[in-house]
């Protein structure tokens, strides 16, 4: 697994999308701050510097992006509940604690005539 870290970047998902041809399978891109973070439907995702986990994961496997999103949301909620934190999933990709959104999962695909990879952010 490869790990790339930035102090500041426009978006970890955008970085992977723009550089996927140079990246290995199983690459994580992390940032302390994103200037143009985004969620589903091009919604803006804002976070104060060093206040949130901002990262994306790139994999070259051919898997169903909808299933990946659901599995990731379920995994996060399961870990939080193991820690006695009452978290829940708001379909399709948001994680909530005490009716406050704490995370969103953005899954994007990269196609160039065929599937080149999936980005999970």
Model-identified regions with their sequence ranges:
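Short, acidic (Asp/Glu-rich) active-site segment that either coordinates a divalent metal cofactor
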Residues: 113-121
């Amino acid at each position: 697994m490869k790990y790339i870290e930035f102090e500041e970047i426009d978006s970890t998902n955008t970085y992977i999308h723009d550089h996927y041809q140079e990246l290995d399978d199983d690459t994580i891109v992390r940032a302390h701050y994103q200037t143009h973070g985004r969620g589903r439907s091009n919604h803006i995702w804002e976070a104060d510097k060093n206040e949130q986990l901002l990262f994306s994961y790139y994999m070259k496997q051919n898997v169903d992006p909808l299933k990946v999103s659901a599995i990731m949301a379920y995994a996060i909620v399961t870990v939080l509940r193991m820690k006695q934190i009452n978290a829940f999933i708001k379909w399709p990709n948001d994680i909530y604690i005490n009716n406050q959104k704490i995370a969103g999962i953005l899954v994007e695909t990269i196609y160039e005539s065929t599937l080149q990879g999936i980005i999970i952010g």
